[in-house]
From Swiss-Prot:
GO molecular function annotations of the record: 3'-5'-RNA exonuclease activity; exonuclease activity; nucleic acid binding
Keywords, sorted A to Z: Exonuclease, Hydrolase, Nuclease, Nucleus
Residues annotated as domain Exonuclease: 277-426
Localization per Swiss-Prot or TrEMBL: Nucleus
Protein name, as recorded: Uncharacterized exonuclease C637.09
A family per Pfam: RNase_T
Assigned protein family: Belongs to the REXO1/REXO3 family.
Bias (Basic residues) ranges: 67-76
Region described as Disordered: spans on this chain: 1-92, 517-540
Top-level EC class: hydrolase
Length: 631
């Protein structure tokens, strides 16, 4: 029997004609509100079947339907925006029973642009028409400015006020037109700390698939790990402000400053089987700043090969014994000077030598010695919060070596003990591989995650103060350095034309609100000082009010300049941190003095009462805000 006959008979045996099949599908789909799609599908199928009156095979029909769905979906995403397909956010006051987390904001971005899950707290209409997301960190705004104050355990405090109902600051009329609600948003942290709101947004959790891939690569790399794998890069030298060796300057002719010495040799290739020397120095304060008072060098056999006290060139003003372990008595008869140490280093350290240490940049700067092959344990191990925070050597020794160091208290540190700890930390790292001792390994840059999207990778950019490319913007397609908020606006608008995801940060409100200022914790009783303080506070209020007005204009300009189909999301990161910072300064001062002074000699006290106040201040600081809209 011919293929045509076979198909027709099979269709009759099933008791289903082509028209019956179409009608059945139409009814089924129409029940879900898609009558228009079914009508087009019916017409297309009728035309396809008019040539031979025979239904295609099931496989070919599925392929055809799949292709048509993809074409229609693509055509729909390319439609011009109108009232019917315009993307928008839909919510009610009762949607929120607790504050959002910054990770919730991140998931909203992934849902709109990539492979995220639908959020439960907001409905995104026509999300296929959203083509980019612009995120701004805007510290300096507080919940109380928008008519509410979130309180944990009280769900009514999270109801969302409408900004247009006289809840927003009078300086923000345009802002309140662009955004209709303020969303209470809680920063990550614990009882005593507020974690970085920058990392919270720009780092994304790894999927299980990515974790398996990472673990497989880690196991493979561990068996081939060697010390040279952990040499610092040129970029790390710059970022950590290491003194640069002439050969590191990429061919540029460099003259060593007076008094400085560089290691000699051919450094065009890394050492294959290097001699590794751990070095640690103790310093004292002199009339000309910090100077070397002791130098210790330990080899990889854990043997001390050099340990000398050094006579400072300038008069000592503070032996800082509680940190350095140096006393006047220890330096009294010392004749070794810095140039003697430099001569030893130049003789001992060559092109096959790697210098090892913890935050070795400070040691080398005091030694006035440069060398291009460096391993820094502060870089090859992570702080628990991840980069850019650096771990202390004491914490690394406790965590990974199960060893207590620097516990002499008032007697200070021991440079030999610190150098030995660095040796053991490197041995442990080489044994276990590059991923050992790193935190945030279950996270990746949001820019990496977006770039893996299929079928079209999404590209991200960043605009921030300073040099974002050296830190938070390393993984971004493009990073723009800005000097003020106006430059941030210009950069974000420009970047949004060619990028799917743009992150930026405003700083003016934060400065005007004194969020990042060091507050004086002491109260003065002088009446003239009180009058002066009142005047300063009035100036600060005026300055903040003016900053709000400029912020309002920038948001209007930014919103008007963005392309249609843009998700614009602002978050403050935290609430007001001033009280927390003030108490934390007292807390740190107490900890510092408690190590070396008697109780009645302490300049500050830290009791249970201060501790509870501090915990409460941290809690309040974690209460931030976010604002979102779609243009």
């Amino acid at each position: 029997m011919s293929k045509m006959g076979s198909s027709s008979m099979g269709e009759l045996q099933d008791g289903i004609t082509q028209e019956d099949s179409i009608e059945k599908k139409s009814k089924n789909v129409a029940s879900h509100g898609e009558k228009r799609k079914v009508k087009r599908k019916k017409e297309d199928l009728s035309m396809d079947g008019s040539n031979d009156g025979v239904k295609d095979s099931p496989d070919s029909n599925d392929d055809s339907q799949s292709k048509k769905k993809k074409k229609k979906k693509l055509k729909k995403s390319q439609q011009p925006l109108n009232e019917e397909n315009y993307p928008r956010l839909q919510t009610t006051e009762n949607n929120l029973q607790k504050p959002l987390k910054i990770s919730d904001l991140q998931e909203l971005v992934f849902w709109c642009l990539a492979d995220g899950q639908a959020p439960s707290w907001v409905l995104v209409r026509n999300k296929q028409m959203i083509h980019r997301a612009v995120i701004l960190l805007v510290p300096g705004l507080e919940p109380s400015q928008f008519g509410f104050q979130p309180v944990r355990g009280n769900k009514h405090s999270f109801l969302l006020p409408n900004l247009l109902n006289e809840n927003g600051p009078i300086q923000l009329p345009d802002f309140c037109e662009v955004f209709d609600r303020a969303w209470p948003t809680r920063s990550p942290g614990d009882r005593f700390r507020v974690f970085s709101p920058v990392n919270a947004f720009l780092q994304s959790p790894l999927s299980n698939e990515q974790k398996k891939k990472r673990d497989k690569e880690t196991r493979a790399m561990a068996s081939f790990s060697k010390p040279s794998d952990y040499l610092m890069s040129y970029e790390s030298f710059i970022e950590d402000e290491y003194p640069l060796h002439p050969t590191v300057m990429k061919g540029e002719e460099v003259t060593q400053p007076s008094g400085w010495v560089a290691s000699a040799g051919d450094f065009h290739s890394p050492p294959i089987n290097p001699k590794i020397l751990a070095i640690d120095c103790e310093m004292v304060r002199t009339e000309n700043g910090l100077e070397i008072a002791r130098v210790t060098i330990v080899d990889m056999k854990s043997e001390v090969i050099y340990d000398e006290f050094v006579k400072p060139e300038s008069p000592v003003t503070d032996y800082v014994t509680q940190y350095s372990g140096i006393t006047e008595e220890k330096l009294r008869n010392v004749t070794t000077v810095l140039s003697d140490v430099q001569s030893y280093l130049k003789k001992t350290v060559d092109n096959n030598t790697v210098l090892l240490g913890h935050s070795l940049n400070s040691d080398l700067n005091c030694l006035k010695f440069t060398h291009p092959h460096i391993i820094d344990t502060a870089n090859i191990y992570n702080h628990t919060r991840g980069p850019p925070s650096k771990p202390s050597l004491k914490w690394l020794a406790t965590k990974w070596l199960r060893r207590e160091i620097q516990k002499a208290g008032a007697l200070g540190h021991d440079s030999a003990e610190d150098a030995l700890a660095c040796v053991d930390l490197l041995k442990l790292k080489v044994k276990n591989g590059p991923a050992f001792g790193l935190f945030n390994q279950d996270f990746e840059s949001i820019f990496h995650r977006l770039s893996r999207q299929q079928p079209t990778p999404l590209i991200g950019a960043i605009a921030d103060y300073g040099n974002p490319e050296s830190c938070i913007g390393k993984a971004a397609h493009k990073s723009v350095s800005c000097a003020n908020d106006d430059e941030v606006v210009s950069a974000v608008v420009s970047l949004s034309d060619m990028h799917n995801f743009v992150w930026g940060r405003f700083r003016e409100l934060e400065h005007a609100a004194m969020w990042n200022a060091n507050r004086n914790t002491k109260q003065e009783n002088n009446s003239d000082t009180d009058t002066e303080n009142d005047s300063v506070e009035e100036d600060q209020v005026t300055s903040y009010s003016s900053a709000l007005e400029r912020f309002n204009r920038r948001i209007r300009l930014l919103y008007d300049s963005l392309p249609k189909g843009s998700l614009l999301l602002l978050y403050t990161g935290t609430g007001n941190p001033i009280e927390m910072s003030k108490l934390n300064a007292i807390r740190q001062q107490f900890r510092k003095e408690y190590q070396t002074k008697k109780w009645d000699e302490l300049s500050v006290k830290w009791t249970d009462e201060e501790n509870m106040k501090y915990i409460s201040a941290v809690e309040n600081t974690r209460n931030g805000l976010s604002f979102m809209t779609i243009k």
